[in-house]
């Protein structure tokens, strides 16, 4: 009998012999593997599994017609090994890259000879070890095993895969696994939702709102009762997705059953409310949970409230937050000072910002590149892009080196004002200083060239990004899909979308809205409708923006009936029809010379409490001019002023056109 097939020797681990040196045919030898302390000698088994032909046979989707007799004898010699020994061996093999192939071969060996049950528990243990170490994507692992290992997959296995996918920051894979659980009528556990939310929260970009709503709907459908940690993750996720109303509802639900979310979730919600300008609600939440409660506010909580005051340009209240922090013994950090500096910059108080920088240094908080990037962003938003050079000089005078974030803001500043030469100079400078561009850098640069009409250069930059160590993200693909759509390069659009999915990226609401917009503007209405249907099939809810893009596309071509059908579909999906959509519908009727229907939309607005804006009245005047009802144009203009709507340049131009035609007709 070959040495590799000898039965295991039942010896204490310190007397365990090593397998003969020549017993393997693979580079992954058992002597190079750390074997766990055990009453059993696994060396012969590992030597056998290290053979490439054996490993290929075990992991093949098609089982062999017959199993060699020596393998049967080897398996029989391990029939008395208890389950916990197999688990210990598997964990140890999974701990090293060198022994990982043996772990892959061991599982089907155990399955083939029925040596350990349940096998899914072993596979779940291996998945957990790999996800903790981050050395292998879980879906790749699943594909490496024959379907017979778990066919159909068990809930334990799917939940383990879901957790591993989340740990690997692959929410798309995790969502697919959640769908598989539902397809097989398995009940996901709370941990599955927590892992999935963690993967969404651990990304740089905010979670996609449609995905969160889908996830919450699935959780409610399963009738699982969230615990405090899961409520906290849900509140944090919706807050980061800029959906404070949904986060507030979740907070109320948690409190109704006596649960208190973690302080970081409350802080995230305060920050979201402040960002939305809802400072009164942010203040109330801060008082309820921190000042009136048992939890003492920390720096991050104060910063969240401070962000709201900066958002509404309430400098007095912002300065009071700093005073209160001092009175409560809470030390301000760099983010605190950067928010105040940002407030001063946005108010045009550059000298006050410089004084605060000095105070910051006096308090032992050295300003970083981030603080200066906030100053630069403030000037950018006020249109003072030329001050970018002054900020850079001040930064260098303070001994602070620009980092990636600062360069990203600088590139964005130049890009917004079509100073593409300066943007490329900043890009090249950061590379010269050894700072590698990240996905934000590339996205900003590519988008700036797209908007500046430099489409060829944008495509070149995208290719450079592909070749770099920074793979394109969802936002990158959205930018390129929009660029190719504007050029009506439809094969390129489809290829870009396919490539995006192949990279494991999930098309988000912006992706679908972009597709609907570019297809609609080019008259490819079938493709636009198909995108909406595909989105619904993926469990995502079309946004009002998407419907508006399609209504507007129909309106531009005077296809009023099609536009009206889209509005009806929008209402059927439970979405509120906005002024923007109704204005586009008026335009569609106007282009189709259907003035009566155009004015019926105006009546619909009034009956439903929607206030017509200047675009509404301007579009109606344009419709009247198109059907040569010039005498009614001044009447609509007068009605606009009476309603309190201030006319703009286009409205006045429409009035002049109407009066000009009236005068011409009278002369004639």
From Swiss-Prot:
Entry coiled-coil feature ranges: none
Main location: plastid
Compartment list: Plastid, Chloroplast stroma
UniProt-recorded Gene Ontology molecular function terms: mRNA binding; single-stranded RNA binding
Keywords of the record: Chloroplast, mRNA processing, Plastid, Repeat, RNA-binding, Transit peptide, Translation regulation
PPR repeats: 154-188, 189-226, 227-261, 262-297, 298-332, 333-367, 368-402, 403-437, 438-472, 473-507, 508-542, 543-577, 578-612, 613-647
Xref: Gene3D superfamilies: Tetratricopeptide repeat domain
Transit peptide boundaries: 1-64
Subunit relationships: Component of a multisubunit complex.
Described function: Required for the translation of the chloroplast petA and petD mRNAs. Required for the processing of the petD mRNA from a polycistronic precursor. Binds with high affinity to the 5'-UTR of the chloroplastic petA transcript. Activates psaC and petA translation by binding their 5'-UTRs.
Family assignment from sequence similarity: Belongs to the PPR family. P subfamily.
Stated name of the protein: Pentatricopeptide repeat-containing protein CRP1, chloroplastic
